[in-house]
């Protein structure tokens, strides 16, 4: 420390030198010292350093002054508080100095100090004291109005301080407001402007009283309307306040908007511009409160969008031949200058109107149909705008409209969406000709910016409406070529033109482009050869698509591609051979050449084998190998049967080696490539090549990656079909892995189907030691030997399905094996595991093969219904249902008879019936529907809920067989006197709804409202199942319920409330325990709300929705967890609405995070509380992603509470890490 002090005193001495270079060097060295974390200054050194730095601020040399100011930053954090106060005092005094240079340098110094203070959320006393000290001096400097330059600096610093530390100055807010308000009438516009900025920062942290005073002052001054100049200022101020604190100004809009509307009619362009800008900020920041005024705002914007008093567009408006009239463009360009007028401010009004319409379109999704009637035609008619900046904003507004129209969820554009009448998409479709007509002239404009806007517009249009431009390609192609050939155009314009062409090529049928190929190929080929890599890369994408256009392989085409092949091949091979090009260009050149060989390979002659050799080289390169594998897969699948023999000998072993690389995408790509090679080139592959691949397969067949396993099994299936002689190699480790995977509980879905296909293909190859009985023993052996216990029930199902697959492939083996399984079930010495497997296998075999010849089968299965093992009983129930599907006339009447005569076995027999209804064909079941229906209705009033649920599922699935007859019958039971019957039919409806189109959908749409009326049922349980059914509809087929939301939501929200009358106390021994019978229904209601966020957001009043989310944040553990998830979704989906409610949301989150569990609680309680805290923190992290959320005083206070609590800080940090790593994973293109 002594040496540091000595070094610093040495520097201080040099700073007094008369030589400016000495002073500069010494100050620079001091700066370096102060930036070191290790530096510690004693009191004396601190005092001397501060004194010297302040002295150097008045140095004659400007460079020394600048360095001294920079030293203030690190110095503030290294010296004691009273020294910081000395610095601030001196700087404030110097700010009022007569010397201009000293004033300037001192104000920079103050900004530096303020910038270095710890944020308000840290709760630092230093920050608070310094800010208070500065505030008093600044307010007096601002209020004096003596020297404008001092005022401007003071206002600047005040704004800076309020934005960083506003929360610490709450006591000063009234005096700050008092000093700022008079400045709004300053004769200097610069002073007014900075005052508005300062007020904008003030309203983010000030208390309500100050905020009300400010708004009342502005409203009163606006009502007086003393002078046009101050009125403009007040409107600007209101807009600024709305931008910074929209959630606070909302309640005053009823008073503000009529005033602003009135001022729009005053003949003052500047005032109009500010009024429309104010509307824009209201629309973006006060979505709920502005809603009643949106139509008024749209009308004003539409009026002023065309406001151009100094220019006459008439000659262009009705040009019927505009599509062909390219010649007249230059004359129009020349006329601009005659009308151009330096005093003409009308363009600013038009720009404000376009931006405000953009805001309306972006925030009011529910008004889309209305926008297409009014806003869309108006914007299209303004694409001809003469002022470039305005035109760009008009285009941007239309882009926003298109983006809002793009279907976010697939059901929006599904044919089964069943929304009648004009939809936004059909309205857009009808306006496409007008859009193209308006864009056509703009695409030949000199302005690069305009042409870029046109390309962005066309790209978005085609993304929203694929195929929309089919009729208009002849008009658009010349415009695209114009930009590609334009020598003066920028790289970005060419990239946009190419990217637009690519999207158009991808989304229209090839025939549309055939007349234009001759014109398109030369400019695209030229772009492939462009020296700028980004243009080349984009052009290669277009070339690849052009290849598919000139010779589509998936449809007949009479187009002659021959004249273009040489040019396309030559430009691509040049890029493929080049070694020193950009990575993306390398990859796209490989993909493009792959497409050329796939579609045109039969025309390449000797070039083909040379090109394939280059592919072989690229396969050996780590950077290009994955792209090359994909290209080879494409070529190998080509119907042209490309000759790959020259590269297979060397290529297949390389591909085999990729299977052991630690790169998942490469493994998957390679398995696809090998699969297609085996299918199409088996006669060119040698046994050695295939053995090399088989050696690599065992590690890939594992439950740790089911997708890779599935691909590997599919490859083996292909091998069994086309190259059966190679299978003798698999009996060792590959088969062990396969059998191991069959026993895995994770084997389901696609991987299980692949496994079944494989066993069926394998068993018919006649390979030694891999016959039917061999494979059967391998699959079932462990169950019989009891050597390895199969812990998971799913494993038995998988083995049984494999047994059935083998038996279907070898039907002659069936009777003996079925007989054996029947004996296994009968045998009293069989373990439960053996019985379980035997029953499931009988079920799976019987599903596909008629087992009615096995006379004792029925009695054996019914006997198993009496087993003490629940799993055996369940398997017997499944087996009976599954066997019945194999021969309905034999088994279904038997099952129905048993249900009637065996009340004790009813539950199991109903499960058998459910299996029959779920799996049998509609035609097969039709004759039995009436009998089954009558039987089910007898049991739908059963008091046992489990039985009722099975009955409901059967009723629902049966209804799908004959919806026209059965759905009205179901509806009839809604008036049943039994609440059990009502809950059964409402649950049944849930099983008629699926996520794909079905014949029942239109019928269901007409009557689902009747079923949902049970949300008003007096019985709690009926209301709960109605919510579950509603949730299923909202999730799987939202179009069923979208139009009913206005009537359903009040009842849904009603069920989110805690009901005191449903809470009761139960005595458990010496303890009293509270039971809430309403919890389940509240949970169901909140689950519906969560689903609606994804499927019907545009139909929700989000503020009403948030009211109930707020209640949920204070509810039971399960509901809190759901509402935390909702907050995370809401932060992304409607951030501005959440921001308005932020202060009300923070409190319950804070309460959850700071709740302590009683020390004597059980471990579960601690775990639950911990999970609650983590979920609440996730919600906080999501809220903080909303721009300006951290500016809320309550939120910043909560943040400082989190950072000062080690436990909460640790949780918060880990959640932020998790979310950033999730984002990185989602970016992983593999």
From Swiss-Prot:
It is found in: Cytoplasm; Nucleus. Interacts with TBP. Part of a complex that contains CUL1 and RBX1. Interacts with unneddylated cullins: interacts with CUL1, CUL2, CUL3, CUL4A, CUL4B and CUL5. Does not bind neddylated CUL1. Interaction with cullins is abolished in presence of COMMD1, which antagonizes with CAND1 for interacting with cullins. Interacts with ERCC6. Interacts with DCUN1D1, DCUN1D2, DCUN1D3, DCUN1D4 and DCUN1D5; these interactions are bridged by cullins and strongly inhibits the neddylation of cullins. Belongs to the CAND family. GO terms for biological process: cell differentiation; negative regulation of catalytic activity; positive regulation of DNA-templated transcription; positive regulation of RNA polymerase II transcription preinitiation complex assembly; protein ubiquitination; SCF complex assembly. The modification N6-acetyllysine is found at residues 55, 971. GO terms for molecular function: TBP-class protein binding. Key assembly factor of SCF (SKP1-CUL1-F-box protein) E3 ubiquitin ligase complexes that promotes the exchange of the substrate-recognition F-box subunit in SCF complexes, thereby playing a key role in the cellular repertoire of SCF complexes. Acts as a F-box protein exchange factor. The exchange activity of CAND1 is coupled with cycles of neddylation conjugation: in the deneddylated state, cullin-binding CAND1 binds CUL1-RBX1, increasing dissociation of the SCF complex and promoting exchange of the F-box protein. Gene3D superfamilies: Leucine-rich Repeat Variant (1.25.10.10). Detected in heart, brain, spleen, liver, skeletal muscle, kidney and testis. The modification Phosphoserine is found at residues 335, 558. This is Cullin-associated NEDD8-dissociated protein 1. Residues 315-344 are annotated as: Disordered. Keywords: Acetylation, Cytoplasm, Nucleus, Phosphoprotein, Repeat, Transcription, Transcription regulation, Ubl conjugation pathway. It comes from Rattus norvegicus. HEAT repeats lie at residues 2-39, 44-81, 83-119, 131-165, 171-208, 210-247, 248-282, 289-366, 370-407, 424-467, 471-510, 515-552, 563-602, 606-643, 646-683, 688-725, 729-768, 770-808, 809-845, 852-889, 890-927, 928-960, 961-998, 1002-1039, 1043-1097, 1099-1133, 1140-1189. The modification N-acetylalanine is found at residue 2. One of its GO terms (cellular component) is cytoplasm. Its main location: cytoplasm.
